[in-house]
Structures are given as structure tokens and as C-alpha cells.
Regions:
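Extreme N-terminal leader/targeting segments of oxidoreductases
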Residues: 1-21, 38-39, 455-462, 468, ...
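N-terminal glycine-rich phosphate/pyrophosphate-binding loop and immediately adjacent elements
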Residues: 13-149
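Mid-domain catalytic core of redox enzymes
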Residues: 2, 16, 261-379
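C-terminal segments that line or cap access tunnels to active or ligand-binding sites in enzymes
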Residues: 329-437
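Rossmann-like flavin
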Residues: 106-213
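A conserved FAD-binding loop/helix module that cradles the flavin
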Residues: 70, 479-501
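A glycine-rich dinucleotide-binding beta-alpha-beta segment and adjacent secondary-structure elements
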Residues: 192-206, 360-366, 421-483
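Helical element adjacent to the flavin cofactor pocket in flavoenzyme catalytic cores
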Residues: 219-276
Length: 508
């Protein structure tokens, strides 16, 4: 349901609107705040860190600007809708630039694939690798479109609050191969092993193992082709700033350094929050954008809850992330905005990461060069980069205080030997984020990068619900609830609130 734009508020008297407290200022929390403000709530967003954005915060070092987390904007209409709820157009505040290609996928021997939304170009790329797989590729994309139509367009913003709602879609899940893994679905259409890798890697963008993630996530291929892959000029942080501006324009409040210690529950209902310093903030509803495991395991304290400690410990978490941010005193014009560098192993590496929780000697990498599109993110004649390696989450027991620098050096050597010659001698600034930082900064369970692993038994009804099963007037948004991680996922989780949160009733 698309709520109409809120009318300007009369600020001459006291604000009698019902109060909504949003815990966390990630994209899920910010989008929820905008939607609630548009529906008549007075909104307060509480962020424990010293800047907005959660995983989408911004690092500024030595004249370089680095987006900390999300860099790939798909389904931009989900952002545009938030601006329209406030009677504005996003294009007046944010410049989105389409990427062409979306990514360049590079294998160890130097063979590369330019992945884009151009149908003719994609057929030609597939034919370069395996001419006999072109018909299978076309059939796979038709399948992806069918899955996207149901899994994203029809169900992505629908709450799964009870078991019957899940049972109703079971026939669709079977018909669309939701019980198979993404890799298995791709392999039904495509025979060339490298092409199977190219068309099955997408679950890694939301923390999933292509060999275990539900085949429903094959929808990502069509989602990207339909709505494109974009970059926000100025960085993803510009989207965070834009949403914060919308919230303020609605009369909402954003507070940094506000560490929520617990959600106050009285008579089975959420009635506000208590900060670490002892301050109590009353609320009519509470929306948590915190990690769902932290919400249920810590913020609700001793409250009776279905997602109890034992259930949380049994759940499968997404992978961890090792991210190295660096700036160079030279430019690398031959490097695309988004590059995926595949290592020597695919299935074996993912087994090490997700099952064995072993930090392998080899790795696959995602390299982000935002200055390919926006040179102002670095000093003149310089480039800004971040490189991300999927790694085990903290269940693997790795000591990142000891392992981080040797691992970074191995990544640097791999980049220097492939796409960034002379890298070591060109570094101007350098720092890393590890799974331990995800646990410390974002209170992420097991230091995972994306919350729960996106497998079928942890999807839709099987995830923590958008409306708490245990506490009235408590709602969840973000990667840890339905529909899941990634920008389209967390923005859609806020969209679900339109169906489960009552409209504000303002006293006369």
C-alpha cells in the first residue's frame, strides 16, 4: 500500500501525534521512519553510533570518502517512493547514475565477463564463453522474471505473520524451485561451469551461499535487468543524508549517540525504550532496526519470546565480511566501478566459509572503485577503493586482531598481481573492517554481515516477523526480518509496516 504524501504539520501548538521510536538508522530504520511520519506519527530515530546510516555510514580519511557498506543500488523506485511520500522528487536531491556494465566478473586466468542489463550484449557475452548455452541463458532469465514477479513484486512487501500465510505460497515456492539452491536452478539451464558461477553468485550480495540459498533468490538477475544497477553521486551516504532530511521535514527527530539498553514492555506491549544512561523515552510503538538477534536476545531482556536464546543459537547466520578501504595516489582508469574477482575455487571456498567456518588461503573479492563514476570522492589524480572478501562469521573462532593485517597483505598482493599493478607503492590511506567490528559496532550476532542466512527454512514466515509475535506494538525492519538483506530487502521490510502498523490516530 502506497500511503499518500503527508500534509504539512501545524506546528503552532503541542505535537499530539502518536509517538514512534525507531531503534537504529540503517536504511530499514530510516525508511520506516519516513513511512511512519507520512502516516501521521511523530518519529524519533535513535542511533547508538555517532553518525547515521548503520552499515551505510561513511568513512572520511585523508581527503578520501568511502561508503562503509552498501554500494549497489537496485530497484531505485523503492527510494523514489519515500521522497514522494513527502511530496518531493528524489531526483531533486540525489543524482543516480546507471552502471554499464553492472559488474565485470574476472577469473584467475584473466578471462572476464561484462555483466549488464543489455539483452543483446549479454547474449554475446554468454556466447563468448559457451555458444551452446545461449538458449539456456534465455530460459534462465525467463525463469528469473517469473520468480521476481512473485517473490519480489507480489510478496516482497507482504507480511508473513502466521503459518497459513506461508502455506498459501507453498505451491508457488515449489513451482518456482524455491526448494532447490540457486546454483542447482542455474545448472538446470546452463552447462558451462564459469557461466554457472556468473549466474549463481548473486546470493553472496545478501549474505547467502549459492549452493544453499533458496532458488527464490534467482529473482535478483531479473530485478537487476528490469530496474538496473545504480550509483548515488557523492556515495551511498548521500541517500542516508537525504532520508534524514525527509524525516526532519516531517517534524521527526534523529539522535546520535543514543544507545538503547532495552525495550520497555508493560502488560505485554512495548511502551518505549530505556537508554544506557538511564533515560526513558515513552512511545506508542517501537520499531527495531537493530539486528533481530540483538532485539530478541538483548533488548527484550527477560520477556517471554519465541526467538529465545536457544532458537537464536540454532539459527544459521550469514557469512562474515572483511573489508579493506584504501586510497591511491594514482588512478586506475582501466578498472571498472564494480569488479568481482573470482578465486581458484567456488564451491570449495564457499564450503570453507559457510560450513567449515575456516579462513582459507584463497579468496574471491568484490572491488569497488567509486571514483570511476565520481572523481570527487578522492583528491585530484587519486582513486578510492574498497575491497570485500567473504569470510567465516565469528562462529569460526578466528582472532581478527591477529589475522587482519596478514589477510589484508594477501589481498593486496592478489590485487597487485591482477588489476592494480604498483598498488603497494601507491597507497595513501588504508584501514580495515572485520567480522569483529561488525559485532562491536553494529551488534551483529556472530559478526555476520547480513543477519540470518537466506535459506528456505529461514525465509518469509520462518524469519523473525515484521510484527513481533510476542510483544504488542513492537515491529522489526532490516536485514534480520522479512524479506531479508540487501537494499531492496530492507526497504521492502519498511514497506511491510504499511500493512501491520495502524494509521496514527491524532487526538483532537
Amino acid at each position: 500500500m502506497l500511503t499518500l504524501a503527508a500534509q504539512p504539520r501545524d506546528v503552532s501548538g503541542p505535537d499530539r501525534r502518536p509517538h514512534a521510536v525507531v531503534i537504529g538508522s540503517g536504511f530499514g530504520g530510516l525508511a520506516a521512519a519516513v513511512r511512519l511520519g507520512a502516516r501521521g506519527y511523530r518519529v524519533t530515530v535513535l542511533e547508538r553510533l555517532e553518525q547515521w546510516g548503520g552499515r551505510a555510514r561513511v568513512h572520511r580519511r585523508d581527503g578520501f570518502t568511502f561508503d562503509a557498506g552498501p554500494t549497489i543500488v537496485t530497484a531505485p523506485f523503492l527510494f523514489e517512493e519515500l521522497w514522494r511520500l513527502c511530496g518531493r522528487e528524489m531526483r531533486d536531491d540525489i543524482a543516480l547514475v546507471p552502471m554499464l556494465p553492472f559488474y565485470r566478473i574476472r577469473f584467475e586466468d584473466g578471462q572476464s565477463f561484462a555483466y549488464s542489463g543489455d539483452r543483446a550484449a549479454m547474449r554475446a557475452e554468454v556466447a563468448r564463453f559457451s555458444p551452446e548455452d545461449v538458449p539456456g541463458y534465455e530460459r534462465f532469465m525467463a525463469h528469473s522474471e517469473a520468480v521476481c514477479r512473485v517473490g519480489f513484486e507480489e510478496l516482497g512487501h507482504v507480511p508473513f505473520g502466521n503459518l497459513p500465510s506461508m502455506l498459501r505460497i507453498a505451491p508457488d515456492l515449489l513451482r518456482l524451485s524455491g526448494h532447490r539452491s540457486v546454483y542447482d536452478v542455474v545448472a538446470r539451464f546452463i552447462r558451462n561451469e564459469r557461466l554457472r558461477t556468473i549466474f549463481s553468485f548473486h546470493p553472496l550480495l545478501i549474505g547467502g551461499n549459492p549452493f544453499r540459498a533458496s532458488g527464490i533468490y534467482c529473482l535478483i538477475a531479473h530485478l537487476e535487468r528490469q530496474w538496473g544497477v545504480h550509483f548515488a553521486m557523492g556515495g551511498t551516504g548521500r541517500l542516508v543524508e537525504g532520508l534524514a532530511g525527509l524525516i526532519r521535514g516531517q517534524g521527526g527527530t534523529l539522535r546520535c549517540g543514543a544507545d538503547v539498553a532495552r525495550i520497555r514492555v508493560e502488560g505485554g506491549s512495548a511502551t518505549g525504550v530505556v537508554l544506557a544512561g538511564g533515560e526513558t523515552i515513552p512511545a506508542d510503538i517501537v520499531v527495531s532496526n537493530a539486528d533481530s538477534a540483538f532485539t530478541y536476545g538483548t533488548l527484550l531482556g527477560g520477556a517471554t519470546r519465541r526467538w529465545n536464546t536457544r532458537r537464536l543459537n540454532r539459527a544459521s547466520s550469514s557469512m562474515g565480511l572483511f573489508v579493506w578501504y584504501f586510497g591511491t595516489r594514482r588512478k586506475y582508469p582501466e578498472v571498472d566501478h564494480h569488479t568481482i574477482l573470482m578465486g581458484p575455487r567456488y564451491r570449495g571456498l564457499l564450503r570453507d566459509i559457510f560450513e567449515r567456518k575456516h579462513l582459507a588461503e584463497d579468496f574471491s573479492l568484490y572491488l569497488h572503485r567509486p571514483t570511476a563514476t565520481d572523481p570527487l570522492l578522492a583528491p585530484p589524480d587519486c582513486d578510492a577503493f574498497y575491497v570485500l572478501a567473504p569470510v567465516p562469521n565469528l562462529a569460526g573462532g578466528q582472532d581478527w586482531a591477529r589475522l587482519a593485517e596478514p589477510f589484508r597483505q594477501r589481498i593486496a598482493r592478489a590485487l597487485e598481481d591482477s588489476v592494480l599493478p604498483g598498488l603497494t607503492g601507491s597507497l595513501v590511506t588504508s584501514f580495515v573492517t572485520t567480522p569483529q567490528d561488525f559485532a562491536d559496532d553494529f551488534l551483529s550476532f556472530r559478526g555476520s554481515g547480513f543477519g540470518l542466512e537466506p535459506v528456505l527454512t529461514q525465509s518469509a514466515w520462518f524469519r523473525p516477523h515484521n510484527r513481533s509475535e510476542d510483544v504488542a506494538n513492537l515491529f522489526l525492519v532490516g536485514a534480520g526480518t522479512h524479506p531479508g538483506a540487501g537494499l531492496p530487502g530492507v526497504l521492502s521490510s519498511a514497506r511491510v509496516l504499511d500493512s501491520v502498523v495502524p494509521d496514527a490516530c491524532v487526538p483532537a
